[in-house]
């Protein structure tokens, strides 16, 4: 399926309710035109206040997503967001806390959230440029 910003907003709200107890404020959402990154979460911290600002969730529109794979990528980025929001991991790493939370969600809800994903198995979205897709097979 090809994705839209509205679709990501809807899925964010659904996954926040299902997996994060509605604790995460809605971030800004953008579509990435990248075959190298499936998703990315970024934010900045307000020094001295322990607040997270400028939350940005980006999901690649380069791929023709299957429902489960898209869910796992969005939840992966939401784990980064949750850990930053709760000041558990302020560096947005795939460290011990990330892996522990991913394992808990995977076992409790039957997800497949991983640190890395093999995008060579994904189909290119019909609207995605072809050159980058073929370059992804070379590099």
Name every feature range the model reports, one short phrase each.
Residues 72-84:
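Active-site recognition of the HExxH zinc-binding catalytic motif
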């Amino acid at each position: 399926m090809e994705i839209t910003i509205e679709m990501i907003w809807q899925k964010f709200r659904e996954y926040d309710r299902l997996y994060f107890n509605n604790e995460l404020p809605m971030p800004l959402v953008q579509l990435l035109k990248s075959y190298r990154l499936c998703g990315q979460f970024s934010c900045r911290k307000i020094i001295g206040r322990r607040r997270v600002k400028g939350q940005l969730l980006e999901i690649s529109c380069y791929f023709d997503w299957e429902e489960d794979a898209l869910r796992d990528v969005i939840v992966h980025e939401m784990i980064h967001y949750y850990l930053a929001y709760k000041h558990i991991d302020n560096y947005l790493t795939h460290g011990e806390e990330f892996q522990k939370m991913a394992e808990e969600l995977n076992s409790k809800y039957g997800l497949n959230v991983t640190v890395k994903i093999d995008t060579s198995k994904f189909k290119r979205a019909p609207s995605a440029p072809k050159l980058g897709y073929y370059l992804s097979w070379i590099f």
